[in-house]
Amino acid sequence: MSGLGARDIGHRVVVRHRIPGGLTDVIGVLQSWAPDSLTVRHADSSVHEIRAVDVTAAKTIPEMPLRPVDVEQLFLATALGRPAVETSYVGHWLLRASSGWTGRGNSLLPAGSPGMPVAEALKHTEAFYDERGLPPQALVRLGSPEAEALRSSGWVDARPSQSDVLVMHTTLDHVNAAPPYDVLVAEHPTDAWYAAAFDGPVPEPAPAVLEGAPNAVFASVTLDGQVVAVGRGSMTGHWLGIDAIRVDAGYRRRGLGTAIVQGLARWSGPLGGRRTYLEALLENTAAMATYTRLGYREAYRYRYLTSR
C-alpha cells in the first residue's frame, strides 16, 4: 500500500485509488489497516473502505493546522447553541433569563453595540433582571471592549473565587474517531439521561434550556444495564457545541467522556459540522487534560460580572 501500515493508524493520509472510470484521492485519518484493505475517515465523519488492489499511491501527510477562530462569531454561536428560556435585546446585546438556572441562561451577553450609551443599556439590563427577581449578571469575554466598558461602569466579578471559563475549539476530524463504546445519540433525552446528568431532582428550568435549541441531541453510553455517561450536542451553522458531559463516578477514567465527544462529532459530520467547541473551568485540570489531548485549543476566556 505504498508505504502505509498499521503504524500509521491515527495519522492523516492521502490515498489515491481506482474507481469506475478513473482515479480519485481520499484525504483523512487512517482508521484501520490490513494487508488487503484500509479505511480512511474523512473530516465529515464518512468512512471510506478501500481495497488494497485498488490503491495506486498512499502516504502520510501533515496534520491540518488549526486555523484561527472568529472569536466574535463563536461568542454568539455559544448562545445560540444553548438558548435561554426568555430573551430580549438591547441593541445587539442579548438579555437572557431561565429562572436562575445556570449562569449562561441568566446573564447579559454583551456583543456588538447596544444602540445607546453603555450606562443607559446597563440600566435596561438591571431593570430586566430586577423584574424577574434575578441578580444582574453579564457574561463577558476577557479582554473585549465590552468587558472593559462594564468594569469602567462599576461592574465587578460575580464569582471572584472561581477560575476563568475557557471556551475551546478544534476541527471535527480531531474528535470524530470511532468511539470505543456504543454511543446512543437521540433527539430527545430520556428519564435515564436526566438521572445520569443530575444529582437529585432535575432543576425545573433545565429541560426547557437543554431541549430548547432547534438542532440539539442527547448522547449516552449504557454499561451494566445503566446509563453511565451523557452529553449534549447542538449545531449552529458549521459549529458543533458540546456540553453537559457527565460520567458516573464509578466509571471514570475509562474514556467514556471522550466517547461521548466522539459520538456527537460523528453525528454532526453529515449535518455539515466542521468545527466544535466546548467549555471548561481552568481549575478543572482533568477535563482540561482530556480536551487538550483531543486537540481542543483555547479560543477565549470569560467571566461573570455583576453590578451588585
Regions inferred by a protein language model and the residue ranges of each:
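Conserved beta-strand-loop-alpha-helix junction that forms the acyl-donor binding cleft
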Residues: 139-146, 249, 278-288, 305-308
